[in-house]
């Protein structure tokens, strides 16, 4: 990731500020400088906040980032543009705030844009999803960003001096090692679950074993005394237990079957005795009922006599009823004959009236026939009258259109001849255009190669000149450096140390006298005068310091120039001069112009020919269409003439309107005549049919009357014969018998009921006598007592058998469950043994006492330390190396870092380093960390790094080494920014981002030294 542009509104001390990082050329090293509290670190906070919604340091909350001088109605926002993998993105984040005058908080906003074809297109517009998009895009979260891109103030050396637990938190975030801890927890939970399941199975086995029924049997009790943990012994005892249970069940079953047989015998005897007793009682009752039934015999015989008489008189009664019906029919037939005769007379009168109307209508028949003839002949004309009328209307228009179409057709034919003359023998040549295009492309390629080579040669000359200038500067500075070193060597440094002893010598002089023994050398003091020129010594010391400072500055300049020469050499190696044509640029441009002119001429000719061909095709099509229209016009004109001739010939009319009026009038007259004729014919037909019907009815009624008279005569003869047979003299005898008919159904029912009951009792007495014959009735009370005794014994044994059978089956089920649990338990212990061992190993129960996560983190830390030591060796002049403390214990350990001093060949605690040495180690470790994370993550693009403070603890030489390290980072293509108050850095680093504050707000600007 490489910053391009940063815009801050109401953020920290910046009310409205923009920083254009594109002014930093070639990823050069730059310094961020300013007074304390001016807002230098806020620049890093702004970049981190724009991307992740957090500050660059964990101590700063989001609310602390808003400017105290911001307008209460304006939000805090940051807009950050950056480049990642050759693609440009922009993020805009607005912080939440309570707008002045409101009580509710305005929510945060976050938008992510990507530049596509020179314009920004939105990718995300929500805070949570947008932040997640940035994390996935960069490949790091906020904590990783602080470790890789921004080394914040106060946290620069945190990773170096942190203990194992703190390092674990940092490394866990950077290398996503929580998944290994998650694996450990998963395995731990799995083992816990498996152990719980195993324990549960032991409990289930024990519970089932305790629930097995012993039947108070000593053998079973002995088998059940085995402890449930002895699962192998349980397996041995289970078959024995099941066999003994079956023996007990068989014994109980035998007793039960004997009791059932004894009960069935007494039950059968009791049932038979009860049936015999019931049959005897029923027999006695039926005999009494039979005697009572016989007493009703005389009454039943009287009823049967009446019913016989009623049956015999039935025929006579039927004849009497039939006589009445026949007499009624004769009267009705006479009435029908009279009515029918009257209807026939009325129909004859109606027919005479209609015949008169028909005669009057036939007198107009000739006139109607002539009209029908006209209608038949002209019906086809009238049905298509619109066709003939349209012909009269269109004939003149078609004559005019035909003449006009003929003129237009002649004009088009003349135009076609003109176009064909223009085309002549010319043809389009597109192959020539392709050939010319290829030639022009080749010439352009040759011209571009020549121009690129000229540009590359100019760039090469410029770079060679820059390189020569830098080498000259290095030679000049090397010469000056040698002179300064020679000048420095001329000073006698051994006498310069007395300058610091001036006050000490004065104290000794004040304490001794001439002739005393010197407390330093032991000689006698001869003189107390001034033998040392301390002013001269101080002057020489200042001269030496000035020379050393100049030497140091020249060395720094030489190092910078060497880095710049290295960068120039890389550019020179990237310059590629291609093989070019032997022709000059002028000749190629001339050939290009000639071919372009030829191409344009051929294109114009092709275009002209295509236009003429298109015009020819267009004219041909128009001529064809005109000819079709002319043919159609002539056809339509002929059709109109034929239709008019046809109309006038058939109708004898030359006016459509007159024809239509007369035709419709004739049709109306004919229709009226035909309707009236049809109506009269229909009436005559109806009258004829009605008269025929009535005549048939009259014949029918007369035949019926004759039949009824004959039936009446025969019926009277039958009545006389029946009365004679029954010895009846008059109608009174008949009436008396008829009176009995109301009681006939009741009498029949009474008779039938008596006979049915008589037969049933007779049959039942015979059945019961056969069932009780030769059988003795036993004492019911004795049988009942014996029955209850046998039944109680049987039920007791059945219940006992059911209980024993259930308990045996239950024992079998439980022993089967126990066997199933034991088999599953054995298999489970076998299957889970590897998981138990793996869980112990990843939890730290191994020869190194390390958890899986700590083992992985130690691996990454070793990689980081190895990478860091490459730079620390250079910065410490091969004195210090970082090492990981090997002493480990169970849990979080093994991540502490010590320093190994190659001078003493011993390792010591990191806190024993000086401030400058700690900075060197922290910087080397931080750079090593970022590089290892980039190697492991793959997708992270580290194109920039920013360092906040830490350089103030370095001496001049160490500062030079640190700067060389950062310059090497810059030469690898990474933008490096530093925040520092060290004045030496302002002189050494040419590009400075100044942050100025007026106690109200801050502003920034880039300047070059």
Curated annotation (Swiss-Prot):
<feature type="coiled-coil region">
    <location>
        <begin position="392"/>
        <end position="502"/>
    </location>
</feature>
<comment type="similarity">
    <text>Belongs to the SMC family. SbcC subfamily.</text>
</comment>
<dbReference type="InterPro" id="IPR053380">
    <property type="entry name" value="SbcCD_Nuclease_C"/>
</dbReference>
<keyword id="KW-0233">DNA recombination</keyword>
<dbReference type="Pfam" id="PF13558">
    <property type="entry name" value="SbcC_Walker_B"/>
</dbReference>
<dbReference type="GO" id="GO:0016887">
    <property type="term" value="F:ATP hydrolysis activity"/>
</dbReference>
<keyword id="KW-0067">ATP-binding</keyword>
<dbReference type="GO" id="GO:0006302">
    <property type="term" value="P:double-strand break repair"/>
</dbReference>
<feature type="binding site">
    <location>
        <begin position="34"/>
        <end position="41"/>
    </location>
    <ligand>
        <name>ATP</name>
    </ligand>
</feature>
<dbReference type="GO" id="GO:0005524">
    <property type="term" value="F:ATP binding"/>
</dbReference>
<dbReference type="InterPro" id="IPR027417">
    <property type="entry name" value="P-loop_NTPase"/>
</dbReference>
<feature type="coiled-coil region">
    <location>
        <begin position="535"/>
        <end position="802"/>
    </location>
</feature>
<comment type="subunit">
    <text>Heterodimer of SbcC and SbcD.</text>
</comment>
<keyword id="KW-0235">DNA replication</keyword>
<keyword id="KW-0540">Nuclease</keyword>
<keyword id="KW-0175">Coiled coil</keyword>
<dbReference type="GO" id="GO:0006310">
    <property type="term" value="P:DNA recombination"/>
</dbReference>
<dbReference type="GO" id="GO:0006260">
    <property type="term" value="P:DNA replication"/>
</dbReference>
<dbReference type="GO" id="GO:0004527">
    <property type="term" value="F:exonuclease activity"/>
</dbReference>
<keyword id="KW-0269">Exonuclease</keyword>
<protein>
    <recommendedName>
        <fullName>Nuclease SbcCD subunit C</fullName>
    </recommendedName>
</protein>
<comment type="function">
    <text>SbcCD cleaves DNA hairpin structures. These structures can inhibit DNA replication and are intermediates in certain DNA recombination reactions. The complex acts as a 3'-&gt;5' double strand exonuclease that can open hairpins. It also has a 5' single-strand endonuclease activity.</text>
</comment>
<dbReference type="GO" id="GO:0004519">
    <property type="term" value="F:endonuclease activity"/>
</dbReference>
<dbReference type="InterPro" id="IPR038729">
    <property type="entry name" value="Rad50/SbcC_AAA"/>
</dbReference>
<dbReference type="Pfam" id="PF13476">
    <property type="entry name" value="AAA_23"/>
</dbReference>
<keyword id="KW-0378">Hydrolase</keyword>
<keyword id="KW-0547">Nucleotide-binding</keyword>
<keyword id="KW-0255">Endonuclease</keyword>
<feature type="coiled-coil region">
    <location>
        <begin position="176"/>
        <end position="364"/>
    </location>
</feature>
């Amino acid at each position: 990731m490489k910053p391009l542009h940063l815009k801050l509104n109401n953020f920290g001390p910046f009310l409205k500020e923009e920083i254009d990082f594109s002014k930093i050329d070639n990823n050069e090293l730059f310094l961020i400088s300013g007074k304390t509290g001016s807002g230098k670190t806020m620049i890093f906070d702004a970049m981190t906040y724009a991307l992740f919604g957090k500050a660059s340091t964990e101590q700063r909350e989001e609310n602390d980032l808003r400017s105290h001088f911001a307008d209460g109605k304006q939000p805090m926002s940051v807009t950050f543009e950056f480049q990642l993998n050759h693609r440009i993105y922009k993020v805009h984040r607005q912080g939440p705030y309570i707008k002045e005058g409101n009580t509710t908080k305005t929510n945060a906003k976050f938008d992510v844009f990507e530049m596509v074809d020179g314009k920004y297109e939105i990718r995300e517009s929500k805070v949570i999803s947008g932040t997640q998009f940035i994390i996935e895009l960069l490949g790091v979260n906020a904590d990783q960003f602080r470790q890789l891109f921004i080394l914040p103030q106060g946290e620069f050396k945190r990773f170096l001096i942190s203990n194992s637990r703190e390092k674990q938190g940092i490394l866990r975030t950077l290398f996503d090692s929580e998944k290994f801890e998650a694996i450990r927890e998963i395995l731990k939970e799995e083992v816990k679950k498996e152990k719980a399941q195993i324990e549960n199975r032991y409990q289930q086995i024990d519970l089932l074993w305790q629930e097995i029924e012993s039947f108070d049997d000593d053998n079973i009790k002995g088998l059940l005394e085995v402890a449930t943990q002895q699962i192998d012994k349980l397996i041995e005892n289970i078959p024995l237990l099941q066999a003994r249970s079956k023996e007990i069940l068989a014994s109980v079953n035998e007793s039960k079957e004997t009791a059932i047989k004894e009960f069935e015998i007494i039950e059968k005897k009791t049932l038979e005795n009860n049936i015999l007793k019931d049959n005897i009682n029923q027999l006695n009752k039926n005999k009494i009922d039979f005697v009572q039934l016989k007493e009703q015999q005389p009454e039943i015989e009287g009823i049967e006599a009446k019913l016989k008489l009623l049956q015999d008189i039935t025929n006579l009664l039927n004849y009497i009823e039939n006589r009445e019906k026949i007499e009624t029919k004769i009267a009705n037939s006479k009435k029908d004959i009279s009515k029918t005769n009257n209807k026939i007379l009325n129909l004859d009168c109606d027919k005479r009236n209609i015949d008169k109307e028909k005669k009057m209508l036939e007198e107009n028949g000739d006139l109607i026939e002539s009209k029908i003839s006209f209608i038949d002949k002209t019906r086809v004309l009238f049905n298509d009258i619109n066709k003939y009328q349209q012909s009269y209307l269109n004939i003149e228009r078609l004559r005019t259109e035909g003449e006009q179409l003929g003129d237009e057709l002649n004009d088009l034919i003349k135009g076609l001849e003109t176009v064909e003359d223009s085309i002549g023998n010319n043809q389009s040549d597109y192959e020539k255009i392709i050939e010319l295009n290829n030639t022009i492309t080749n010439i352009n390629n040759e011209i571009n190669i020549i121009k690129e080579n000229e540009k590359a040669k100019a760039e090469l000359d410029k770079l060679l000149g820059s390189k020569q200038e830098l080498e000259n500067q290095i030679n000049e500075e090397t010469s000056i450096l040698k002179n300064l070193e020679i000048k420095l060597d001329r000073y006698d440094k051994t006498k310069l140390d007395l300058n610091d002893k001036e006050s000490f010598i004065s104290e000794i002089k004040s304490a001794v006298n001439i002739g005393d023994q010197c407390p330093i050398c032991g000689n006698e003091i001869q003189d107390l005068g001034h033998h040392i020129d301390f002013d001269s010594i101080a002057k020489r010391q200042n001269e030496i310091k000035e020379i050393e400072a100049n030497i140091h500055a020249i060395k720094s300049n030489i190092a910078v120039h060497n880095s710049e020469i290295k960068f120039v050499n890389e550019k020179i190696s990237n310059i590629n001069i291609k093989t070019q044509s032997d022709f000059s640029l002028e000749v190629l441009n001339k050939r290009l112009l000639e071919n372009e002119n030829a191409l344009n001429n051929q294109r114009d000719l092709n275009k002209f020919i295509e236009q003429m061909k298109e015009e020819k095709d267009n004219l041909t099509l128009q001529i064809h269409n005109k000819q079709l229209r002319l043919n159609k016009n002539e056809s339509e004109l002929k059709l109109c003439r034929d239709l008019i001739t046809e109309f006038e010939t058939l109708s004898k009319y030359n006016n459509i309107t007159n024809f239509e009026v007369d035709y419709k009038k004739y049709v109306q007259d004919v229709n009226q005549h035909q309707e009236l004729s049809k109506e009269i014919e229909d009436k005559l037909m109806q009258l004829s049919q009605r008269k025929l019907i009535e005549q048939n009815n009259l014949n029918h009624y007369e035949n019926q009357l004759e039949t009824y008279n004959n039936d009446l005569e025969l019926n009277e003869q039958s009545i006389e014969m029946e009365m004679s047979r029954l010895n009846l003299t008059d109608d009174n005898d008949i009436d008396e018998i008829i009176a009995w008919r109301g009681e006939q159904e009741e009498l029949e029912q009474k008779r039938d009921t008596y006979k049915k009951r008589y037969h049933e009792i007779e049959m039942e007495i015979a059945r019961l006598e056969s069932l009780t014959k030769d059988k003795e009735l036993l004492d019911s009370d004795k049988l009942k007592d014996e029955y209850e005794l046998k039944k109680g014994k049987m039920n007791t044994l059945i219940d006992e058998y059911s209980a024993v059978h259930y308990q045996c089956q239950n024992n079998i089920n439980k022993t089967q469950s126990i066997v199933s649990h034991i088999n599953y338990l054995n298999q489970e212990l076998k299957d889970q043994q590897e998981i138990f061992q793996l869980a112990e190993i990843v939890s730290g129960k191994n020869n190194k006492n390390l958890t899986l996560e700590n083992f992985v983190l130690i691996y990454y830390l070793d990689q980081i330390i190895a990478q860091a030591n490459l730079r620390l060796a250079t910065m410490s002049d091969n004195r210090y190396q970082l090492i990981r403390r090997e002493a480990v214990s169970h849990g979080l350990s093994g991540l502490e870092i010590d320093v190994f001093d190659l001078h003493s060949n011993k390792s010591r605690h990191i806190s024993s380093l000086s401030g400058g040495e700690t900075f060197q180690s922290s910087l080397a470790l931080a750079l090593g960390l970022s590089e290892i994370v980039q190697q492991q993550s793959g997708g992270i693009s580290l194109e920039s790094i920013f360092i906040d403070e830490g350089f103030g603890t370095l001496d001049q030489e160490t500062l030079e080494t640190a700067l060389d390290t950062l310059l090497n980072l810059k030469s690898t293509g990474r933008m490096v920014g530093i925040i520092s108050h060290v004045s030496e850095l302002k002189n050494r680093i040419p590009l400075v981002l100044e942050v100025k504050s007026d106690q109200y707000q801050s502003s920034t600007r880039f300047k070059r030294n």
